[in-house]
Amino acid sequence: MWRSYKAETPELADETQEVDLNLHDSSESDHEGRQSRSASITSSTSAPASNDVTLQVPITNSSATSPTPSTGSMYFIAGMFDGKEKVNREQPPMPTTDGVEYPRAASWAAGNCANVLNDDKGKQLFRVFLFQSLAEENLAFLEAMEKLKKMKISDEKVAYAKEILETYQGSINLSSSSMKSLRNAVASETLDMEEFAPAIKEVRRLLENDQFPRFRRSELYLEYLEELLPRSYAEKWAQSFEGLLGNHVGRHHFRIFLRSIHAEENLRFWEAVVEFRSSRHKANAMNNLGKVILSTYLAEGTTNEVFLPFGVRQVIERRIQDNQIDITLFDEAIKHVEQVLRNDPYVRFLQSSQYIDLLSKLK
């Protein structure tokens, strides 16, 4: 039976957060020295559905109509693909950990992008990540659109809309139809906000399906989490294999250890199946992801091959061929992989410098 892995939280049960383990991309460190063995499961059809996000953008008293967002306005450079301006980009400040406890920061990676965008410190950390990924214009565009919606004076609103178009049309990646709608909206004196909707939707989808998954697996986010992680959480991993897998930081350090003993593909497979199960309400996404998992981890001779008992892989292959794909497709395979990880690598990890050194750093 598949287990539900939860992150360690304070003793209050109602504060427990489900850990979202969707596997969309790996962090840069995950690829170091292991590019031939790491696999990234990405699929636009398997990505979580985009939800509307209410961006909490501070409203300034200034009458200026610059589309540069008030939060972080000193470092956003319009036309970021211009060489001179790109060199002059100034990194936004990292958010401090003051007033932030581990469960709050861990919740930023759960669910969808709204969780991080609706938290001031989470959004600032996400902003830093986007800056490092040369993609901060996407968040800045959404913030500018939120400010536009809140403006009341029509003349200022029209002028601001024109500046938004001038600022972002060369840097955000929009389809031709959405860009046309954006230009039509700006050209109209009535400023029908429905004309802006396609562009807003596409940028939100890009954040949700591409940049947010990268963020929650990034070194930047994991290091921030590790700074907040109480030692008591990490100590519990010695008694709970499930607790280790259900914790972002714990799973990250376990992955590094598994890489050192050439067994990382087992955890990658486990994470991919978690994502597969999370797509159970999207038939096409589940079908596509099931086939990707089969070819990436279970095909004979693949670099990331996970070895299963005789017959288990054949059953999976047959079910996929017969289009009998459901949430139980990988159940037997996961039981075996969990047992493999628990029997030897988990025990060795608890005795490793990777775990001991982490404990020594935590308070």
From Swiss-Prot:
Modulates chemotaxis responses by regulating positively the sensitivity to CO2 levels in BAG neurons and by regulating negatively the sensitivity to quinine in ASH sensory neurons. Residues 112-225, 240-359 form the RGS domain. This is Regulator of G-protein signaling rgs-3. Keywords: Phosphoprotein, Repeat, Signal transduction inhibitor. It comes from Caenorhabditis elegans. Residues 1-70 are annotated as: Disordered. The keyword Lipid metabolism does not apply. Signal peptide: none annotated. PROSITE patterns: RGS (PS50132). PANTHER family: DOUBLE HIT, ISOFORM B, REGULATOR OF G PROTEIN SIGNALING. One of its GO terms (biological process) is negative regulation of signal transduction. Pfam families: RGS. Changing residue 154 to A: Hypersensitivity to quinine which may be due to loss of phosphorylation at this site. Disulfide bonds: none annotated. Residues 36-50, 58-70 have a biased composition (Low complexity). May be phosphorylated and activated by egl-4. The lineage of its organism: Eukaryota, Metazoa, Ecdysozoa, Nematoda, Chromadorea.
